[in-house]
């Protein structure tokens, strides 16, 4: 079961400002990536469930984080149904991120007091997610929006907490644009942990992780 409450997870999202996203089938390489992000200051990792037996990799990573990386909060993304959410929560997921807004996922996460962040693309979807108890909404796909969209949302709904995923890079100007617009945190995947970076050195993950302007 989850080690951290949804309020604790939400607070760390706000404090650190960045949620790295990553999937790889190799457990040992995944541990190295997780450690590199941790060394760079990340205290959350969204393990994206996108491969066969991904739950087995996550289980190993979560055990590693609990044993070796104090304060590292493991969650799971790309979750598309309540059954998958329940499986990952049984394996200790502290938060669930989804590409779509689904009430069935909200119900199983709320039952266990686990933070869930649904992918939303309109203000109507965001409002519905908040009515279902969402603390931090995922703006997805972020690369079809821009910081101006965040400002437009925060006008009538200043209480809304938003995490854009996609369209966010490690460049300081890009990050500054999103945070100046009012996002709570950002999700960064291939722009931070790319296949090319993995072929070079994991320091290329640690260094950009430190750039989040919080």
Which residue stretches match the model-derived regions?
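Short beta-strand/loop segments at the ligand-binding rim of alpha/beta enzyme cores
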Residues: 16-18, 65-75, 109-117, 156-165
